[in-house]
């Protein structure tokens, strides 16, 4: 288990899973919106100096989020997230893949199966993210690409955003 910027990350290579926990000093409703509305997602999802740009977000079961990560030099990496289940202000599950700008999967990168749970706390809320992979090599590839540090940085951005919005 590794704690980075108030983000707890544990890796279970044998079971092909990552578990990320972060607490926020913000009400659950505000945290939920930041995870489910494109205008807010674009402000925190990418680790700086990268930015996230949403092309489309249809947050419903069977819907999708098509976005790109834009680097400081203009490099664009597209991703597609397909929403599977949604329990409003409680949890959602999805599958995320790298794609082209039309949402066609890039099979040279692994799929990530996300389960995100939102829990109210006495000081705000906690988000628990469980990510599973099809095999251990896929998990290793994502880790080698810097996922752990990048996602932790994004969650730090979310902390800043939540403090700045009413």
Task: Locate predicted features.
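A conserved amphipathic terminal alpha-helix motif
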Residues: 2-3, 134-166
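Short, surface-exposed coil-to-beta transition loops
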Residues: 19, 52, 76-81, 110-114
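A short, structured loop/turn motif at beta-sheet edges
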Residues: 28-29, 58-60, 84-91, 117-126
